[in-house]
């Protein structure tokens, strides 16, 4: 069985804007994936649509209800994947918790603009922003990049690309443009309690995305303490040694094992489907 349980569409701000769900489903069919989950950031709107609209002409495999939830726990930002929940109740909850895509991206953008102005950094407020399609951190970073006067600021803080900027502004409290995402996103328990209440399970996404040992230990401890049901063992960023370590941790603690491509249609190397799965029968065996 060929699975991919971590796929995004353009309902997520971080995905390619042309990547509508129809296109994604056709790609999954062409890839001959047996089982997939569309896990858009902070919304499960696709799965509500999928209950109303017949998509079997686009994709003939099994679709598991899914969503990727942004989380902030004690100042640490990461993602949790939710699966197998009631999509309608969850859509209502996600809008109350995160707001619409436009709401949350505009809110983040406005806070960052205020910080930029307070630090007297160069920025063009006349460049339009559309929270429905624009990723707030990307908008701010690319806007600031246009001004050579900001080069010294970027160099001083070791920022050479968008990933550096995003990580600094969401994880480094001493960074001048740090935004406490705990004021924007819920904590682990809020997500776990709700998803469990609507019949679903919660999985830690990309446990080893951070190469910081302290962060990894914090995330794995958080899984066990907050009732998270599983971990995403198989991911393109995980090495063979990473997978071996995570499999051992999951089996020891009787956790659900999942895997996915984290496909968003942006990077040429980011392909649908996952390889090197040791035991397909272990993948997302729901409790």
Segments from the language model and where they lie:
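Hydrophobic, aromatic-enriched interface-forming segments
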Residues: 118-191
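Conserved, well-ordered alpha-helix/loop/beta-strand core segments that scaffold catalytic motifs
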Residues: 174-224
